C-alpha cells in the first residue's frame, strides 16, 4: 500500500443534448439558363415529290425549388408555319417519343421527372394560337431540383408544299406551371 498517494476516479461521462434546427423556405419554379431557346431551326429541305420530315432538338431547363413535390408541366401552343400566303398543316409539328432527361447538378441534385404525357404529341397551331397543351410534365413527387429535358421535334413537310426562298416560320409559346 502506498502512503500519501491519492487516486481520483474519473467522473462519470456527462452528456449534454443540443437541438439543431433549420427552416427551409420554398424557392421558385422556373425555366433556367435561358431555355427554351429563342430560335429553333429545322434543316433546309429540298422537295422531292414525297412527304418528308425533318427534326430538331430543343432543350428545356427547369428548376423546381419549391420543395412541394406537387410536380409541374410545360405547355405549348403555336401559329402555323407560314411563308407569305403559303402554310404547312396545323398538325405538322410533333414530338414522337418521350424526351430524354438529365439532372443538372450531380450526384444528388434532383429527382428526375416522371411524365404522365403520352407520345406522340402534336403541337397545337392556329392563326390565333389555340389553348396550350402539355408537352411534358413531372408527376407528383418527381421533378424536384434542376433538370433538363430534350425534346426532338418532327416537322412534316407534305409533298404538295410550296417552295419558298423565304423560310417558313411559326411562333411557339411555352409556359411552365405547377402540377402535372
At which residue positions do the language-model features occur?
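Signature of Gram-negative chaperone-usher
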Residues: 12-180
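Sec-dependent, cleavable N-terminal signal peptides
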Residues: 1-14
Amino acid at each position: 500500500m502506498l502512503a500519501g498517494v491519492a487516486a481520483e476516479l474519473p467522473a462519470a461521462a456527462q452528456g449534454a443534448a443540443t437541438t439543431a434546427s433549420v427552416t427551409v423556405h420554398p424557392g421558385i419554379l422556373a425555366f433556367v439558363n435561358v431555355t427554351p431557346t429563342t430560335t429553333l431551326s429545322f434543316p433546309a429541305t429540298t422537295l422531292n415529290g414525297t412527304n418528308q420530315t425533318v427534326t430538331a432538338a430543343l432543350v428545356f431547363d427547369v428548376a423546381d425549388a419549391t420543395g412541394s413535390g406537387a410536380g409541374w408541366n410545360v405547355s405549348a401552343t403555336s401559329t402555323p408555319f407560314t411563308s407569305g400566303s403559303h402554310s404547312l398543316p396545323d398538325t405538322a409539328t410533333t414530338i414522337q417519343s418521350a424526351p430524354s432527361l438529365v439532372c443538372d447538378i450531380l450526384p444528388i441534385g434532383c429527382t428526375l421527372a416522371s411524365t404522365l404525357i403520352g407520345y406522340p404529341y402534336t403541337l397545337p397551331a392556329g392563326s390565333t394560337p389555340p389553348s396550350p397543351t402539355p408537352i411534358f410534365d413531372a408527376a407528383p413527387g418527381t421533378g424536384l431540383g434542376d433538370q433538363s429535358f430534350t425534346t426532338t421535334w418532327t416537322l412534316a413537310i407534305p409533298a404538295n408544299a410550296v417552295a419558298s426562298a423565304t423560310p417558313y416560320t411559326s411562333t411557339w409559346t411555352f409556359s411552365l406551371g405547377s402540377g402535372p
